[in-house]
Amino acid sequence: MPNGKADEVWFVYLLRCADGTLYCGVTNNIERRLTQHHRGRGARYTRGRAPFILLGHAPFPGRGEAQRVEYRIKRQPTDQKLACLATIGGDAFVAGALQSAPAEGITWNP
């Protein structure tokens, strides 16, 4: 497999940038990816928007599943993302992003 092992755990994570915007991404190593973002070597969107606050992350059994959740989260308006995180917590936020996909076993970690 070109991008890692089939049983590798991937994470969806949500950052708050210094300018108040949110960034959602996927990685198989949270610490490494945050370091990349802080050094300006992460996603283009986050360059020049440091420092960041990690609002949370959730594990998934593979890259494809993590990317599907990331896509759904990115399609939500910022105010909806923040309202979900503030009122019902991260588990429900991720479950809401999944909509029709099963949410069992997903834990959102602040």
UniProtKB/Swiss-Prot annotation:
Family: Belongs to the UPF0213 family.
Residues in GIY-YIG domain copies: 8-83
Source species: Nitratidesulfovibrio vulgaris (strain ATCC 29579 / DSM 644 / CCUG 34227 / NCIMB 8303 / VKM B-1760 / Hildenborough)
PROSITE patterns: GIY_YIG
Superkingdom of source: Bacteria
Any Pfam family matching the protein: GIY-YIG
Alphabetized InterPro entries for the sequence: GIY-YIG_endonuc (IPR000305), GIY-YIG_endonuc_sf (IPR035901), UPF0213_domain (IPR050190)
Protein name, entry field: UPF0213 protein DVU_3309
